[in-house]
Curated annotation (Swiss-Prot):
It is found in: Cellular thylakoid membrane. Belongs to the phycobiliprotein family. Contains one covalently linked bilin chromophore. Heterodimer of an alpha and a beta chain. One of its GO terms (cellular component) is phycobilisome. This is Phycobiliprotein beta chain.
Length: 169
């Protein structure tokens, strides 16, 4: 897993270049948002169970067919697996927020997930919607925690939804 700094260094090192103005601005932005990133992670960690529970409730309110007989979250085991997966997405999104890099999502969450879900018959659409709902809830929680700028929170959630979302082939 790389963070924003190591990713930037790697890119410039591979090119054999010194940091230019863009690199310096990128580093400056990352470090300026560092305290807020850590505060966001702290707030998410303190409320993780509630965030996952709210996400599940809202998702199942919007898509009740998921918890009806024959639905992918029908039975206690499947329902629990859905909440477990939402918890994974939240945890890894938090890592990505702190790192300022989406590498951890590629390495630990997204590689092979679409194929795994497809092979198990897990619908991708509700998963994507759940991640979007989670982003909304996280941003509300962070606003309530007094973290004024939460724009950096969008990136990992949007990245996961984009990567998992249906793709035209």
């Amino acid at each position: 897993m790389r963070d924003a700094v190591t990713s930037l260094i790697k890119n410039y090192d591979v090119a054999g270049r010194y940091f230019d103005r863009n690199a310096i601005e990128s580093l400056k932005s990352y470090f300026e948002s560092g305290t807020q990133r850590v505060q966001a992670a702290k707030a998410i960690n303190a409320n993780a169970a509630a965030i996952v529970k709210q996400t599940g409730s809202k998702l199942f309110d919007e898509q009740p067919e998921l918890i009806r007989p024959g639905g992918n979250a029908y039975t206690t085991r499947r329902y629990a697996a859905c909440l477990r997966d939402l918890d994974y997405y939240l945890r890894y999104a938090t890592y990505a927020i702190v790192a300022g890099s989406m590498d951890v999502l590629d390495e630990r969450v997204l590689q092979g997930l679409r194929e795994t879900y497809n092979s198990l018959g897990v619908p991708i659409g509700p998963t994507v919607r759940g991640i979007q709902i989670m982003k909304e809830i996280v941003k509300e929680q962070l606003g309530a925690a007094g973290i004024p700028n939460t724009s950096f929170v969008d990136e990992p959630f949007d990245y996961m939804t984009r990567e998992l979302g249906e793709k035209d082939i």
